[in-house]
């Protein structure tokens, strides 16, 4: 399934989806949602909404750093997971980075998150692990 991916400033949709998708990980790891941090980071991100038939089904948030695009959020609504939307979003992020002359994608993911399989399949490699979070990177050729 191929989503339409468009720029968005729909902070409410993004926050709701992120909080919902991350709640179990936060609870399991004893983490808490930091609204102030989300507010601050939201203003710094290039954010995109994934749509299927005009229905919002996911969010992708990117931040350009010195030599890499950092995928700060890639969230897909549960009913739409495992249907290729995450893969489509990663391809979009790669094209976006390449267009900007950037040749690395980076992300951080909970080590217990099943999305690890997707990231590894897409060529991301673990750089380091701290506090149950993997820092991963993929070089874009």
Which positions does each model-derived feature cover?
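Conserved N-terminal entry element of GNAT/NAT acetyltransferase domains
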Residues: 1-11, 139-141
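C-terminal "cap" of GNAT-fold acetyltransferases
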Residues: 39, 65, 101-116, 120-141
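Conserved beta-strand in the GNAT
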Residues: 55-63, 70-75
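Conserved GNAT-fold acetyl-CoA-binding loop/helix
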Residues: 9, 15-41, 45
